[in-house]
């Protein structure tokens, strides 16, 4: 018995007339004059394969009762399909029914249109739909491409901790990790919670970023990256925010902001090319049902050189745009999505790297420029979504870093280990961060980031 994936069976690389076995789930079934036509999917590709069963099979009556979602093992001869819509089909010599759907009428995944809002309520079943099958395969393709890009460019992958004592962003929006009894919290002499009696002997949190930790390895191995889960206790109910998401964070030694921007451009174009080359079937479905520009926008992104513009110049352009924005535009305020999209879509018409932001709106670790007012920071803006990458050259001068930490109200002793990097062989270095789910949203044309991750975690939502 030669078990093959549906993708392999449809690819035209197996000998026609050979016997094969596929294992999967029923997508649809229709009958006609002693025949049953079963569309079977195993998730390996977008298209199902048609299994043709005739009434000579001993369990044909059982086969006719199959419904969407039932699991089976079908064996038979692989032949060119005479019908439209598929290249090959299987003339079944046997169909073993492995699992029935208990009640087809109440099975949540029906062969009919279903809203993303409904499917979020059954997130454990939604990968069985065409949409989320496609999104999941594209997510996997992107993840594989991320690792491949960095490996091919000499980066080492670093596993940074999920439990930490440091706030990498200085914003304080962190989830606390504790085994203390929440009903009877231990107190010290001053009445504060005594975290010395907690599991780790101190306050600990879920990480908001692996950047500070990965910098340590950058200053020893030169080119490194981390790719893992991060957590933000940000009480935001927008379509752009998650409480748990994955971050890609490369870091390069002996590098400035210009080199950081080049790396970001090379990286994005590489992973987009991988999706175009490897997941054309899924992109075609998304272009038909979700975002008509799913393919063309990636091709345009790859072929367009990035435009680079200083934040100060971007503000001037926006102020003279002849357009009324919902959010104010003035020097010293962060750019909002509507501003970013105007720059990329209406004014410049391609991806834009905005650099040198005001120092007070960016993180403490970003390198202070000579003007004393801006930092060597960048945001990569993409048409259709706005910011997709945020990065900077890091502050390598200990005295300047200490002053920045004081400005942000951070205890430098708490970050003594991070300051050590500036005390022992400090070098200029740079990096960026990219929320992986935002990348998935952009590629797939999704309208809500909660559809870009298998089990979304957001305020008031932690199901499954």
Curated annotation (Swiss-Prot):
Documented EC number(s): 6.1.1.22
Membrane spanning residue stretches: none
Record's catalysed reaction(s): tRNA(Asn) + L-asparagine + ATP = L-asparaginyl-tRNA(Asn) + AMP + diphosphate + H(+)
Record-linked PROSITE patterns: AA_TRNA_LIGASE_II (PS50862)
Statement: the UniProt record of this protein carries the keyword Ribonucleoprotein: no
Protein name: Asparagine--tRNA ligase
UniProt-listed InterPro entries: Aa-tRNA-synt_II, aa-tRNA-synth_II, aa-tRNA-synth_II/BPL/LPL, Asn-tRNA-ligase, Asp/Asn-tRNA-synth_IIb, NA-bd_OB-fold, NA-bd_OB_tRNA
């Amino acid at each position: 018995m030669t078990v093959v994936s549906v993708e392999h069976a449809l690819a035209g690389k197996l000998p026609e007339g050979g016997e094969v076995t596929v294992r999967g789930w029923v997508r649809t079934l229709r009958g006609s004059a002693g025949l049953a036509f079963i569309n079977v999917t195993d998730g390996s590709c977008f298209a199902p394969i048609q299994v043709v069963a005739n009434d000579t099979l001993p369990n044909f009556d059982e086969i006719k009762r199959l419904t969407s979602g039932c699991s089976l093992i079908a064996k038979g001869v692989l032949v060119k399909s005479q019908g439209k819509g598929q290249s090959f089909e299987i003339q079944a010599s046997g169909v073993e029914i492995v699992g029935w759907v208990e009640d087809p009428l109440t099975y949540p995944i029906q062969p009919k249109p279903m809203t993303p809002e409904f499917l979020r309520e059954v997130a454990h079943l939604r990968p069985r739909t065409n949409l989320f099958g496609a999104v999941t395969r594209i997510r996997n393709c992107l993840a594989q491409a991320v690792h491949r890009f960095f490996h091919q460019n000499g980066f080492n992958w670093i596993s940074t901790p999920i439990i930490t004592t440091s706030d990498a962003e200085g914003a304080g929006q962190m989830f606390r990790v504790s085994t203390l009894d929440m009903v009877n919290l231990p107190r010290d002499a001053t009445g504060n919670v005594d975290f010395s009696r907690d599991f780790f002997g101190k306050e600990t949190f879920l990480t908001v970023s692996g950047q500070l930790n990965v910098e340590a390895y950058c200053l020893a191995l030169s080119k490194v990256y981390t790719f893992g889960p991060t957590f933000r206790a940000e009480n935001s109910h927008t379509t752009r925010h998650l409480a748990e998401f994955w971050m890609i964070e490369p870091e390069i030694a002996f590098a400035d902001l210009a080199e950081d921007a080049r790396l970001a451009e090379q990286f994005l174009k590489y992973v987009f090319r991988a999706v175009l080359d490897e997941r054309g079937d899924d992109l075609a479905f998304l272009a038909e049902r979700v975002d008509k520009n799913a393919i063309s926008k990636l091709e345009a992104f790859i072929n367009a050189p990035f435009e680079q513009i200083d934040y100060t110049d971007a503000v001037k352009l926006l102020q003279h745009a002849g357009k009324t924005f919902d959010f104010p535009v003035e020097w010293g305020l962060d750019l909002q999505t509507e501003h970013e999209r105007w720059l990329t879509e209406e004014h410049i018409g391609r991806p834009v790297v905005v650099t040198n932001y005001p120092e007070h709106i960016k993180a403490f670790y970003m390198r202070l420029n000579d003007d004393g007012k801006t930092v060597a920071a960048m945001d990569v803006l993409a048409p259709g979504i706005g910011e997709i990458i945020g990065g900077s050259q890091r502050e390598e001068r200990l005295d300047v870093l200490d002053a920045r930490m004081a400005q942000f109200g951070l205890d430098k002793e708490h970050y003594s280990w991070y300051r050590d990097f500036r005390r022992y062989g400090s070098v200029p270095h740079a990096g960026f961060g990219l929320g992986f789910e935002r990348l998935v949203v952009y590629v797939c044309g999704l309208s809500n980031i909660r559809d870009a991750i298998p089990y979304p975690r957001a305020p008031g939502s932690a199901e499954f």
